[in-house]
From Swiss-Prot:
Keywords: Disulfide bond, Knottin, Neurotoxin, Secreted, Toxin. One of its GO terms (molecular function) is sodium channel inhibitor activity. Belongs to the neurotoxin 14 (magi-1) family. 08 (Ltx-4) subfamily. The presence of a 'disulfide through disulfide knot' structurally defines this protein as a knottin. The lineage of its organism: Eukaryota, Metazoa, Ecdysozoa, Arthropoda, Chelicerata. This is U-theraphotoxin-Lk1a.
Amino acid sequence: CGGVDAPCDKDRPDCCSYAECLKPAGYGWWHGTYYCYRKKE
């Protein structure tokens, strides 16, 4: 699975259970890449 800060596909997210696939705020957004971020819980 994809760990924190790993690129992911918003349609087929493969992030680990502790992470979620989100659109970056700031860097990276202009080329449509999503990244795995640690869940807020």
